[in-house]
């Protein structure tokens, strides 16, 4: 779920503020998404959106509401003991996105952009 995802980002990027920083970034970070990603970070969000879309094809899986178990160790997120396919899948979506975010530069000019750029 989004609370776990936010915590995973804080694990890979200590001191970050995931909700304000990433909820309205580029064309894909935040709700929805379209067009061409504006940079590497936005591409991370596009891939994460697709991963959640793939998770929704698992019967009964609702990624935004799915609770899972994970652990943060040395800026790495580790998915732990998630007994259902949905939980394991969603945890991995969030884990991979958090790692991607940690590698991608944050460009303030791509925060709260005019969405006409995303067509």
Curated annotation (Swiss-Prot):
Binds 1 Ca(2+) ion per subunit. One of its GO terms (molecular function) is calcium ion binding. One of its GO terms (biological process) is positive regulation of fibroblast proliferation. One of its GO terms (cellular component) is extracellular region. Coiled coil: none annotated. Snake venom phospholipase A2 (PLA2) that shows weak myotoxicity and induces edema in mice. Shows no cytotoxicity in vitro. Has an anticoagulant effect in vitro. PLA2 catalyzes the calcium-dependent hydrolysis of the 2-acyl groups in 3-sn-phosphoglycerides. This is Basic phospholipase A2. The lineage of its organism: Eukaryota, Metazoa, Chordata, Craniata, Vertebrata.
